[in-house]
Amino acid sequence: MSENPDDLELESEEKQCELKSGCVYLQDSPEKTCNPILSEEAKLKAKYPSLGHKPGGSDFLMKRLQKGQKYFDSGDYNMAKAKMKSKHVVQSAAEKSLVTGDHIPTPQDLPQRKNTILTSKLAG
């Protein structure tokens, strides 16, 4: 690019003509391409130069994504909260209960019955 103001005016006029015709010069190649999508992008870039391409979106979006677990609404939050409580209850109940089904009991393994004297209430 030349730094002469007259040349700069000519270049800007050429760019405006290119935008109107729908043909755009690509930055990497010297040839002209006539793609309507590229011409629309070039028009928008010329109209709004302050809008840059941020690779991950806005700063607000990036901050929200970095915070961690998010819930869509209060219903999702309450369901996740209930799920967490039920997991804790199930785990604690499983730890306290005796494991059954490991072996088959035999009469020798069973505790002895206490001898009780059965008396009839009618006999008295």
Swiss-Prot record:
The modification Phosphoserine is found at S74. One of its GO terms (biological process) is G2/M transition of mitotic cell cycle. Belongs to the endosulfine family. Phosphorylation at Ser-74 by gwl during mitosis is essential for interaction with ppp2r2d (PR55-delta) and subsequent inactivation of PP2A. InterPro entries: Endosulphine. Protein phosphatase inhibitor that specifically inhibits protein phosphatase 2A (PP2A) during mitosis. This is Alpha-endosulfine. It comes from Danio rerio. GO terms for molecular function: phosphatase inhibitor activity; protein phosphatase 2A binding; protein phosphatase inhibitor activity; protein phosphatase regulator activity.
